[in-house]
Every structure is written in C-alpha cells, then in structure tokens.
C-alpha cells in the first residue's frame, strides 16, 4: 500500500533551537517511518523577511541540514530538499498569485500576527510591508501542491495558512479541472517551549533560545540567566514557569 505524502518545511535563518525540536523536529522523526516524507528548506521564503541579509540565509541552509540530520532525520526515509533548487515551485507561485486578492492576504491571521512582530522591518502599522512577505502563504501553497502533499503537519496557529492553500486549490480546480490535491492538516499535540526570558514562545529573532549547536558552556550561561517565577520559593509552591 502506497504511503500518503506528508510535507513540511522550515526557513533557514539560523540553527535549530529547543523550541523547534520539541515543537516539530521530534515529530518529523516519527513521521518519516509512517509517511512518504518531504522536508523543505524554505530559503526563498526566508528571504521575504531577510531580503537585506541573503548571506545569512545562504549560510543557514547548510547549518539547518546538519541540525536536521543530527536529530534523527534519515535521508533514506525522508527527502530533504532546498526550495530554490526547484524552479517549478516559483512558477506555481506566480500562477497561484492570480487567484488570491491582496485583501484576502491581509486578512490572514497568521500573517497579521507576524507583521506585528516585525515592526522594525515593516513599520509600526505595517506601512512598509513587502509583496513578497504578504504573499508568502501563496508560496507555501505552491510548496505543498507541487509535491501533492496530502497531509501537512501544523500547529493551531498555522491553520489559517493551510486554509488559504485549500482555497487556492479549490479555485484552481474549479477553473482548470480536478488537478491539485487538497491538503489536510496533520494536527498533533506539540508543546510550545517558553523562551529564556519568560516569553510565551522561544524564537531565534527574540534572542531567548537555546540552540542545538550551542556549546555546553553557552547553554549553562543561558540557563543561569533565564527568567524564573519569583513566587516559587519552595519546591512545593505553585509555579508559573
């Protein structure tokens, strides 16, 4: 029986951190034994908010592949590929962009949240938002449909991106006939690792992460400086970690 195709991806903007590993990476390692698994290194999408630092993206591609192999992804079981090496993805992105309005992209909750988080790049009210960043959900739709991905591992916060992909598939198939596979969400209980500063999310750009490539002394220094709950004095005190 042919395995179902599952596709996921990650932007190369630095090494993997613990949030990546516990939130997604360890799940990918399990999925490679059950599905025809594709892992995309989304270097083109990484440029949408790193357009002024292409060297960072270029270097991070190699670092990211090494990290993915180190956590247990097996090239004999999972296909790891670099987005920019497949020109057909860029072609599909252009075709799909004709099926999506600017207003629809602006309403995407995930995109709206990310714009707010990147005020230093796009301005306080998003007045400097680029077409490339606003339209990255269209690029993601091209990634998924190019490989006929039936299942896409996502967290709850990423569901709006997958829903936009499904809308594109519906519209394309209505116009040109049943051609594209409609993807479904592969939801799993993935933990969200808090940042060292107490932030709800650990992130590279937030400067609150422990990276898989960190040296032991660096990890120790980061942990010693991490924010803890001042109300938890004794071990049996209730905590808010």
Show the residue positions of the predicted features.
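Active-site cores that bind ATP or allylic diphosphates and position pyrophosphate for catalysis
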Residues: 112-241
């Amino acid at each position: 029986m042919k395995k179902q195709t599952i596709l996921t991806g990650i932007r190369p903007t630095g090494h993997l951190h613990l949030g990546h590993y516990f939130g997604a990476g360890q799940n990918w390692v399990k999925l490679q034994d059950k599905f025809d698994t594709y892992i995309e290194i989304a270097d083109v999408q990484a440029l949408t908010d790193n357009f002024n630092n292409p060297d960072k993206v270029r270097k991070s591609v190699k670092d990211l592949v090494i990290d993915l192999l180190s956590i247990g992804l097996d090239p004999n079981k999972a296909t790891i590929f670099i987005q920019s090496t497949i020109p057909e993805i860029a072609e599909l992105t252009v075709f799909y962009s004709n099926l999506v309005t600017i207003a629809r992209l602006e309403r995407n909750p995930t995109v709206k949240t990310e714009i707010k988080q990147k005020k230093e790049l796009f301005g306080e009210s998003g007045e400097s938002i680029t077409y490339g960043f606003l339209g990255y959900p269209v690029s993601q739709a091209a990634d998924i449909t190019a490989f006929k991905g039936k299942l896409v591992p996502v967290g709850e916060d990423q569901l709006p991106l997958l829903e936009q992909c499904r809308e594109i598939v519906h519209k394309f198939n209505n116009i040109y006939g049943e051609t594209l596979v409609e993807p479904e969400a592969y939801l799993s209980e993935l933990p969200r690792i808090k940042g060292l500063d107490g932030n709800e999310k650990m992130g590279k750009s937030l400067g609150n992460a422990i990276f898989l490539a960190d040296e032991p002394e660096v990890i120790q220094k980061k942990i010693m400086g991490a924010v803890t709950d001042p109300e938890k004095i004794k071990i049996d005190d209730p905590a808010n970690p």
